[in-house]
């Protein structure tokens, strides 16, 4: 199976499929209501900012979208932002998404308390 390049339109759509087929995520996030912008900041391995949108609702990902630098972005309840290299660590399982916030490798904009109550869902999401 060919790996899908991160970040890309194909990747975020496949991510939606994986989330929607995860029984563990559905259980962990059955109460969650909120949308995110996942912001991938440039670093020495990525030369432009990429933003991916996720609409998460009661254990399902209802919609996703992909934006490049300069595109108009939707308003969301949350933004989770970090460098491309740190995003790869999260995707590969080398960095827990919540620990990423606590160690300032990622910045969370939005109700931090709500996200901290959803640590199991956050872990299942990645």
PLM feature spans:
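Feature captures hydrophobic
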Residues: 1-126
């Amino acid at each position: 199976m060919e790996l899908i390049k991160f970040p890309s339109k194909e990747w975020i759509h496949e991510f939606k499929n994986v989330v929607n087929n995860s029984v563990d995520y559905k259980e962990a996030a059955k109460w969650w209501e909120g949308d995110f912008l996942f912001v991938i900041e440039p670093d020495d391995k990525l030369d432009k900012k990429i933003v991916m949108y996720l609409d998460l609702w009661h254990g399902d990902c209802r919609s996703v979208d992909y934006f490049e630098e300069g595109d108009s972005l939707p308003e969301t309840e949350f933004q989770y932002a970090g460098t491309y290299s740190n995003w790869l660590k999260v995707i590969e399982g080398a960095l827990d998404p919540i620990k990423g916030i606590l160690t300032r490798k990622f910045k969370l904009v939005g109700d931090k308390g709500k996200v901290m109550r959803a640590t199991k869902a956050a872990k299942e999401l990645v």
